[in-house]
Amino acid sequence: MNDVQSQPLTLYIACPRGLEGLLADELADFGAEVTGTTVAGVHAQADTAMAYRICLWSRLANRVVLCLLREQGIERPEALVEAARRVDWGAHLRAGSSLAVDFHGQSEHIRHTRFGAQSVKDGIVDAMRAAGRERPAVDLKTPDARIYAHLHRGRLLLGLDLVGGSLHQRGYRRDAGHAPLKENLAAALLMRADWPARARRGEPLVDPLCGAGTLLIEAALMAADIAPQLSRDYFAFEAWVGHDPDAWRELQREAQARANVGRRRVKSKLYGRDQSPPAIAAAKANAMRAGIPALIDLQGAEVAQLTRPEGVDGPGLVITNPPYGERLGELPEVVPIYTALGERLRAEFEGWQLALFTGNPDLGHRTGLRAEKQYAFKNGPLDCKLLLIPVVAQRTERETSSEGDEPQGASGATSRPGPRNDGAQMFANRLEKNRKRLKKWLKQSGERCYRLYDADMPEYALAVDVYGDRVHVQEYAPPRSVDPRQAQRRLLDALEVIPQVLGVRPESVHYKQRTRQAGKAQYAKQDASGERFEVSEGPARLWVNLRDYLDTGLFLDHRPVRRRLREMADGKRFLNLFCYTGTATVQAALGGASDSVSVDLSNTYLAWARDNFALNRLDPSRHRVVRDDCLRWLETAGSEFDLIFMDPPTFSNSKKMDAVLDVQRDHARLIELAMARLAPGGTLVFSNNQRRFVLDAAVGERFAVEDISARTFDPDFSRRPDLHHCFLIRHR
C-alpha cells in the first residue's frame, strides 16, 4: 500500500441538480462519511475501496472527483496557474500519462472554459517540470487522467476525476429514442417512487410510455441488485498512482456475485408499453445490452389501450415520462395522452401508485388524479416535477371547476368526450353553436377552410380555423392581468375539447400562440416540418402549412376579397402588391387575368407563391413574381395595370426595407404611387388589417373611393367587422 492509499480521501461527487439529497443518502448507505452538500454535488470522506464502491455502485452520481486542492480568491488566470502549480501532481499522475482538463465556471477575468482549462494545464506542466518529471501529453479524447477544475465566485476546486466520464452512461443506451431520460435521473425518479422497497416486496412495475426503456432498465437493475457500472470496461482511477488493484478486483467479484444471485431472486415483473414500434425495438436492444431482457415484458400498445398485464394481482407502480409539449405546437397531441392515461389507470389500476414525471404539472393533473406528493427535478434545462399519485377509481372533486387550485382532466385520446368542467363545457357548446350557424353557408358555398371560433368567449381567447379535416388554433397572448396558470388551464381545456367536437384526431390540431409581429418575426419559422397540404378555395388549389409559420399561407378573412378579384379580373392586367403567398393572384388568373405581376420582399412567400402558381398551372411567363420593397418598386415601375390589389401589413420594420412601414401613416403615399400605375378605367382594391384604420381625407378628395368593407366578410367572420378594411379606388 502506498502513501496515497493509506490516507483518507476527500471526494466531491457530482450529480444533476435536484439529486443532491438522494445522493447523500445513497453515499451514507454505502458507508461513506458525508461532510456536506452543495448545488449539484456532495462532499464526502472515504478510503480507496469506498471510492471504488461509489464509482461502481452509485446510481445517481455523474462524477467522482478526488479533491487535491481548494482555494479562494482565484479571479485571474495567473492565480489559477499558480494554484495548479501547488499540487503535487507526481503523487497522482503516472510518468508518461496523458491528461485532459475539464474546466467548469468562470470569473471576471476567466470567461471561457477553454482558457480556464489551458491555465490549469499550464500550472500542471510547470509543477511536473519543477519536480523533474516528464511533461504530460494532452489528449482531449481518451486521456489517461482527466483533471476536474471548478471555479465559482473565486472558489477553486482542483481534483482528479476517478471515473473519466459521466457515470450516467451505463453503456446499454445506444438506442436513445425520442427525448430520453438520463439514466441517473431515471434512477432518482424510481427512488422517489420507493421502487427499491416495492421491488423487495415483489410488486410489479408498468411504464405505459416506455420509449427506449430507460426507466424500466434502471428499475430492473435495482430489482436484480446489479451494479450500474458492472459492465464498464475502464475507470480513470486505473491510471492513478494510488490505484489498489486488489481492492478493485475484490469489489468487482462481489458485484458480479450479487448480480448472479440477484437475477435469480427477482420477484417483480416489469412491463413496458409504447405505441411506437421503433421505440419498443430500441427498448429491447437496450435491455439486451443491460443483461436483463428476461425481466422486462415489452409490447406495442397505445395509452388508450392500456390494460393491467395478464396474471398481475395486487397493487404496483406505474411510472412514466410522457411527452409534455415543451414546444407549443405539440400541445394538442399531448393533452389527450394524459387524460387517456388517467382513464385507463382508473379503469385498470385502482389501488396502484402512479409516478408521473412531467415538465408541465398542469398537464399532469389532466389525468383526473390528485397528487399526494411532488418532487422538483431538472431534466436538462427544463424544470420538471415528479407527481406521486394514488390511483383511485373516481375522478377528483377538483375537476368540477377550472377555477380551483388544480385543473381537471377531460376525455381521452379518442374523440369520445368525458366529464368536463363548466368552462370547458361552455366552450364546447359554443363550438357546436357556431357549427350549426355556419352549416347552411358551408353547404351552399362548398368552403372547407373557415373560421369556426374567434375569441367568442373572453376566457377562451383563441381563433379556431378549420382546414378540411385539420384544425389551426391560435391563442391570443393573454394580458398581464390574467393569471398565467388560469390561462394555461383554459388552453388545455380547449385543446382537449376541439378534437372531440370536430371529430378529428388530436394530431390534426395545430396550436400556436399569437403575438404582435413585426419585420422578420412575421416570416420566422415556428417549426421546420415542411408539412404542407393542398386545400381548395372556389376553383383555386392552394398550399397551406399549419405547422411551420405563424400564418398558414391563406388569410381566411380575405376570402370574399379574393372572390371579388376573380370576378373583376377577366382580360385585365393584374398587379398584386405585398402578395404574400400569391393566393389573390391565383384567383385573378383563374378569373381570366391576361397577365400579372406579384411583388413581395419575402423569399419564403415568393417561393410559396410560385408553388401555388404551379399547382394551378399558371404560365410563369405571363404571371411573374418580383422580389422587392413594394414602395421602392412602385417608385421605379413603368408598367400600367387594369386591376391592382394592395394589402400591406399593418406595420413592418424589415431590414430589407428602405424605411419602416406604418400603414396608417404611409397609406396615402402607397395609394398615390399605386394609382400612378393604374390604367384609366382601372380599379385599385386597397385592403389592410389595421383595426382602427382611418382613410386619409386627401385620398377621397383626389380619387373616387368606395368603402366595401362590410361586403367583404363571409358568415364565418361576420362577428368581426373590424378585422379588415377594404376600398375600391378609381381615377375620377
UniProtKB/Swiss-Prot annotation:
Residues 50-162 form the THUMP domain. SMART domains: THUMP. It comes from the Bacteria. GO terms for molecular function: 23S rRNA (guanine(2445)-N(2))-methyltransferase activity; RNA binding; rRNA (guanine-N7-)-methyltransferase activity. GO terms for cellular component: cytoplasm. Its main location: cytoplasm. Its EC number is 2.1.1.173, 2.1.1.264. It is found in: Cytoplasm. It catalyses: guanosine(2445) in 23S rRNA + S-adenosyl-L-methionine = N(2)-methylguanosine(2445) in 23S rRNA + S-adenosyl-L-homocysteine + H(+); guanosine(2069) in 23S rRNA + S-adenosyl-L-methionine = N(2)-methylguanosine(2069) in 23S rRNA + S-adenosyl-L-homocysteine + H(+). This is Ribosomal RNA large subunit methyltransferase K/L.
